[in-house]
Structures are given as C-alpha cells and as structure tokens.
Amino acid sequence: MVFGTGNEIIIIENSADLNLAASSIIESKSFDNSTSCSSDSVLLIEDKIYKKFINRLSNKGLFKLNNKQKKKLDNIFFIKGTINPKLIAKPAYFILENLGVKNNDSKVIGYEISSKNLDHYVFKEKLLPICAIVKVKNSLEALELANNLTNKEGKGHSCGIYTESEKFIDLAGKKMDVSRLIINQPHSKSAGGSNNNYLNTTLSLGCGAWGESNIDHNLFYEDFCNKTLIVKK
C-alpha cells in the first residue's frame, strides 16, 4: 500500500470559535514536537479576524518571529539541502535558543509570510513546531490557496477547518482535493482517529488517487481481511 505526504493546511474562517481554534491548534502543533504527518503546517486566517486570532494564539503559546528572527531561521533551517537534523522534533524553546531568543513558555513558532512564494520551505511539511501564518482576504481565497498548497505537497491527505458555517464546510468538501476534512478539532490528534470522531485509529492515512494511494481512508484491520464474494446467476 502507498500512503501520501502530509502537509496539513488549516483554515480559520471568520465565524470560527477563536478560543477553541487557538487552543486546538497549539495543542495539535506542539504534540510530539510536530513529528506527526497530521500536524498543522500552514494557518490561513481571514483578514477580518487576523489580528484578534494572532493575539489568541499568542496567549496560548505562539511565538511569532520578527523579520530578523526569520532570517536567522532561514540561515540554519537547511544543511546541504536537507532540513537541519538538529532542529527536527525539537521543542519550540530549543529552536528559539538557536535564534538567540530565550523563551521557555512558547510551544509553537509562527512564521508570518505572504502567499506570493508558495515554494518557500515553510509552506511544506517541516517535522518541527513551526507554522506558516498567512493572511487571506476571505474564505474563497483560503480554499483556493489551501488546494494549491496541498497539490504541491500533501495531495489527498487532510485539511483542517475552524468554522461555524455549515455552508462553508459543504463548499470545502466540494472544492478540496483531500480525503478528510477535520472540523473544529486538534488536527494531529484527530485525523488518525480519536474518541471524538468516527475515524478508525491508525498511523497510516490513505490519500486516495490524489496522493497515489491504494485507499482514501484510515488504514484498518479490515483492509487486511480477505473476503470471498459468492456470485450466483
């Protein structure tokens, strides 16, 4: 069986419960120092709620890098074309120390960036507690950008949405090329199944034909059961 790459795009739509969204994102992104393929990678936040939501995230444990700190991260992120192994799976405070910042309280690092350069490394799976943060004009732009990003890396995997709009959820289901949409839940603890949703619990998530997978659901024991189909005329 083939399983696709994770690169989870999280959309915060303007009707979202911001306290729930902020708590869930920090909980999800900091879990196991963001080594899960279902860990939040990019946050797309609507302009109308952007400043307010960044403040909520900061209150929950986000450290948003300034331009000088972003340049320092850019300089140490790669070694010989690959992610610096000294940073992978390390907690936020350790990464910040390497940027000259002493902060033991932060759980997640935010890298604010525009959507003009989608080839930038922060738009890809990173395996450390750093999130790309992007301001979008509206929910339609968010869906278009989310699809563009997942089609570059993470096609067919998953997308997270924080919203109270059933209309937007339905639209996302029609527009997104992903096998699962995780609604109002900590993504890394939910995409692989949890007590709070009906998904089968697994570490192997199918990505469908989008991601060149054999399955588009969570791998389960039933996938290994042989079945005999009795066919009568």
Predicted regions and their residues:
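Conserved C-terminal structural/oligomerization subdomain of aldehyde/semialdehyde dehydrogenase
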Residues: 101-233
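ALDH superfamily catalytic-core signature
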Residues: 1-117
